Regions:
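Outer-membrane beta-barrel translocator/receptor signature
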Residues: 47, 64-66, 78, 87-96, ...
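Soluble non-cytosolic domains of exported or imported proteins
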Residues: 12, 20-24, 134, 176, ...
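Gram-negative outer-membrane beta-barrel proteins
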Residues: 120, 133-137, 149, 162-168, ...
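Extracytoplasmic loops and strand-loop junctions of Gram-negative outer membrane beta-barrel proteins
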Residues: 95, 123-126, 167-172, 240-247, ...
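Signature of Gram-negative outer-membrane beta-barrel scaffolds
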Residues: 170-176, 322, 326-396
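Outer-membrane beta-barrel domain signature
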Residues: 78-79, 129-131, 173-175, 246-251, ...
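Outer-membrane beta-barrel domain signature, strongest for Gram-negative TonB-dependent receptors
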Residues: 173, 179-326, 332-340
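Acidic, small-polar-rich N-terminal luminal/periplasmic segments of exported/outer-membrane proteins
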Residues: 1-122
């Protein structure tokens, strides 16, 4: 069955098109693929993939996205595990609409399938570097070659993307919306027999960025209260301003790594495919989330640790008979640990008093309960620390 004959709405972007268009990551891909949108929300890790207007799951570590992302057949369950720069590719397929028959429960809006280049027995290598405005340095390198004379081959590739921020921070702080991303991937392929092939892939990527800037506010009561206390905010009358008024640097850190093994075997009557994978994704985010020069929300942080094991088996007919068929099984085992923290700042109580219309409101409540006025509600202290774990094991 050719792509034109397949009963699917699918867009395939080959490696040449990707290179010519300077597609660095999935955020860039939306410029080539109709009906695909990639929205970066308040952190680098909270990136939402949307197909035909549908997509969710970016802001909650306990929810998997409705747009399934697969890299070489391995499911990436969270957006933080798929926002880095792309390695050397063979193609990217975007399937629009529900794809649960072949891709499982988390593909109700569609699928993004990334297929990387396989190792080659023919020696090949390249290195490329780029420079752009805001001191944007990019680099990629790739090398592949045979191992001995037995048909085995390997490849090694990596890259970096570094750029200054373009949103102006307050004096002494780092400009926001910068880039600081690194990645490396190694592959090994060999054929233990003339009917069996094995492909092993290991990869690691890291991200450490100051993100994300808020530059536009509505002129309303909450913002007017900030200004009444002498705080500064973005200019609501200038939507194109790039000045950011937070009083500390934001932190966005992602460490993502994994290993997978794919075994393809010709059984004569059918083809058997096994894909085994383990992935580890650690993220940390902290910001001054009131986005003003006052200390209202001093700390709003999230730390996630996600460990995922998947095993897929597929038995597929060769398509040379009157009936084409496929049968398979899938195991998904995932552990999620998340810690959310919120700290009030030194200006929180003053700010709440202004919003309430009078500082006497909370002082009266404190006095009635024997507290020193100004010492209890919204003090310069922890508001909450929320820790949870989620274990998910599913079979299909």
């Amino acid at each position: 069955t050719t792509l034109k004959e397949a009963p699917l709405a699918v867009s395939v972007t080959d490696s040449e098109t990707i290179e010519n268009a300077r597609i660095m990551d999935l955020n860039d891909l939306q410029s080539l693929v109709p009906s695909l949108r990639v929205n970066q929300l308040q952190t680098s890790t909270n990136t939402n993939f949307i197909i035909r207007g549908f997509g969710n799951g970016a802001n909650n570590a306990g929810i998997e996205s409705s747009v399934g992302v697969f890299v070489d057949g391995v499911y990436r369950s969270r957006s933080a595990a798929r926002i880095g720069d792309l390695p050397k590719l063979d193609r990217i397929e975007v399937l629009r609409g529900p794809q649960s028959t072949l891709f499982g429960k988390n593909a109700s809006a569609g699928v993004i399938s990334i297929v990387t280049a396989k190792p080659s027995a023919e020696k090949e290598g390249y290195a490329e570097f780029g420079y752009g405005n805001y001191n944007n340095f990019t680099g990629k390198a790739y090398y592949t070659n045979a191992i001995g004379n037995g048909g085995a081959a390997f490849s090694l590739g990596g890259g970096f993307n570094m750029r200054d921020g373009y949103a102006e921070a307050q004096p002494g702080l780092s400009d926001l919306n910068d880039r600081n991303r690194w990645n490396i991937q190694g592959q090994l392929s060999f054929e233990p027999s003339d009917k069996t092939s094995v492909r092993i892939i290991a990869d690691y990527s890291t991200l450490d960025e100051v993100c994300c800037a808020i530059t536009n506010f509505q002129n309303e009561g909450a913002i007017n209260a900030v200004r009444a206390l002498g705080g500064q905010t973005a200019d609501a009358n200038d939507p194109f301003a790039r000045e950011h008024f937070a009083n500390k640097d934001s932190v966005n850190e992602v460490d993502d790594w994994g290993i997978s093994a794919q075994i393809d075997s010709d059984l004569g009557f059918a083809n058997l495919t096994s894909i085994t994978a383990y992935r580890n994704n650690d993220t940390f985010f902290d910001s001054d989330s009131d986005f003003t020069t006052l200390e209202i929300l001093e700390t709003v942080s999230t730390e996630n640790k996600i460990k995922t094991f998947t095993q897929e088996l597929r038995l597929t007919s060769k398509g040379d008979g009157p009936l084409s068929w496929m049968v398979g099984g899938f195991l998904f085992d995932e552990n999620v640990e998340a810690v959310d923290r919120l700290d009030w700042g030194a200006d929180t109580r003053r700010y709440i008093d202004v919003l309430a219309g009078s500082p006497a409101l909370f002082q009266t409540i404190e006095a009635a309960n024997g507290f020193t006025p100004g010492s209890s509600f919204f003090g310069d202290q922890h508001a909450f620390i929320d820790s949870f774990k989620q274990e998910n094991t599913s079979y299909s």
